[in-house]
C-alpha cells in the first residue's frame, strides 16, 4: 500500500528557520551525531546541508520559505536550476509554446525539473517511486502553490492520462529504460 502523501507532516518554514539560526555554527557531522528527540532532526540537518551546498545550483528554490531540499545524495543527481530552466524552455517551444499545457515527469526525483516546467505554464503530473522524495514533491508543490499531481509509483503504473509532453531524465532511468 502506498504512503498517504496528503497526511505527511513536515516542519514549518518557521521551524526550519529557527533550526538554521540556532545551529548556524555547527558542522553537519556533529549535528548528525547529536542525539535529539525531534522527529524531524535528520530532515532539518538535510535542510542545513542543502542550504550550504545547493544555494549556488538552485538559487531561487533555496530562497522559498518552507521549500524542502532533498537529501544531498538525491540532489547531486539533479539538474541545476539553469539546466532545468533550459530544458523546460526547450520543451515548451518544441510543443508550440502554449500558455498552459499538461506535462508528465516520469522521474520526479528532487523536483527541480518539475518546478522549471511549471514556470513555463505546465500543469504537471509527476511519478516518483521513492516514498520520501514523492512526499517532498507533494509538499513542495503546495509550498510553490502548484497544482501538481504526485504519484508515488513508477510511470508504468499510470493507467490514463493525456499529456502534451513527457519528460524522463535519462540519468534516473534504470538500465536505460
Segments from the language model and where they lie:
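SAM-dependent transferase fold signal centered on methyltransferase-like domains
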Residues: 1-177
